């Protein structure tokens, strides 16, 4: 399943979530879309405006704490096999 992370470059919460995605080896499973540029219309279509926000194909999860819990529960997809 491919997830979509809507983020803002200058937003500290978004930056921490992007870093966490990479640290957990989840980047191959999560597409990053900037909510101020390429992801703006899609985020609005999904009924969102706040970031960070994670779309799982059914639901928009909003906020650093909630997204952090989701990320922690996902299995890693790391190139190094760890």
Predicted regions mapped to residue ranges:
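Short beta->alpha junction loops/turns
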Residues: 10, 35-36, 59-60
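Thioredoxin-like thiol-disulfide oxidoreductase module
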Residues: 31-49, 77
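Local sequence-structure signature of Cys/Sec-based thiol-disulfide redox active-site neighborhoods
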Residues: 1-33
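Amphipathic alpha-helical interface surfaces
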Residues: 13, 17, 39, 63-70
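Non-catalytic, surface beta->alpha helical segment in thiol-disulfide oxidoreductase systems
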Residues: 55-82
